[in-house]
Amino acid sequence: MLRLCPGDNLGQRSWLGSLLLRAGRVSDALSFVQAWMAPAADRGDVIRHGGTDFGKPSSEALPASREEKLSDYTEASLLYTAAITSFKLFGDCTAARQYLRIAAKLNPIILVKILARLKPPSMIDSESHEIFVLTSSLIRRP
């Protein structure tokens, strides 16, 4: 769908990274969310193939100015996916910690639910539920 509508008018980007991760495509998941967190997305530029033109993901930490910008507007689902995938690909690195810090700032209830080992809801009625359902089992896996 993102290749047909790379501007993502339907909001597919909020969950595709988590689905790629669940499918074992860790590198593609990080490449995807990094494409949507790039400065081009801030400007409203169309992301090539909606971010599904997977490349090699970066392990570099973001500059402070970029971290601040992402903290203001980005969907938490992208950042939680970035945190998990960075950790899986590169270990306990600065980028993984940075993504998690930004995600927790945007939507802290996700971490609370995961740390409390709450069972994911059977019905998704908010962004928090969506992120929790799609990523909680991935975070808990060894």
Predicted feature descriptions by range:
Residues 1-77, 86:
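Eukaryote-skewed repeat-based solenoidal scaffolds used as protein-protein interaction platforms
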Residues 47-142:
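Long, ordered, amphipathic alpha-helical scaffolds
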